[in-house]
A protein has these predicted regions:
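Hydrophobic h-region of N-terminal signal peptides that target proteins for export
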Residues: 11-21
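Bacterial N-terminal signal peptides that target proteins for export
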Residues: 1-11
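A generic hydrophobic-segment detector
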Residues: 9-13, 135-136
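Metal-centered catalytic cores of metalloenzymes
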Residues: 2, 20-70, 74-136
Length: 136
């Protein structure tokens, strides 16, 4: 229930003034999506919104993981890529896109093509324990 409340709050924030034309994506994060796949019971859900002017907002809520970092990366499913946005730890199990985050033109095109992903890192799996492709 807390997850639904947190994601509901994220959706309300993303649905604020001026976000009517945003592309909003719901993302499920699992270890199976990592490259290479990670065996873990940890999961996550995210709501990410991208405006036509390339501004990004949203958050990830995790379960069953003691995360120390979370990022948005650029790469297609099945590949690893560079960090493009560092998420901020804002509350227990919640990571948010920082205010003012914005994609470049090339990154925006990658977003539209489904070639961005969320990655959450733990001490147990420092390269990433759970991942979810951001597919508009």
């Amino acid at each position: 229930m807390k997850t639904i409340q947190r994601l509901g709050a994220v959706a309300l924030l993303a649905g604020g003034i001026g976000l009517a034309s945003a592309t909003t994506v719901h993302v499920r994060l699992t270890g199976a999506q990592e490259v290479p796949p990670v065996k873990t019971a940890a999961t996550g859900e995210a709501v990410i919104s991208v405006m036509p002017d390339h501004k990004v907002s949203g958050a990830v809520v995790t379960h069953g993981i003691k995360a120390f970092m979370a990022h948005i990366h650029e790469a297609a499913a099945g590949a690893n890529g560079p960090v493009i946005i560092v998420l901020r730890h804002s509350a227990a199990h919640t990571w948010r896109v920082p205010p003012g985050a914005k994609l470049t033109g090339a990154q925006y095109r990658a977003f539209l093509a489904g070639d961005l992903y969320l990655n959450v890192h733990s001490k147990r799996h420092p390269a990433g324990e759970i991942r979810g492709q951001i597919k508009p």
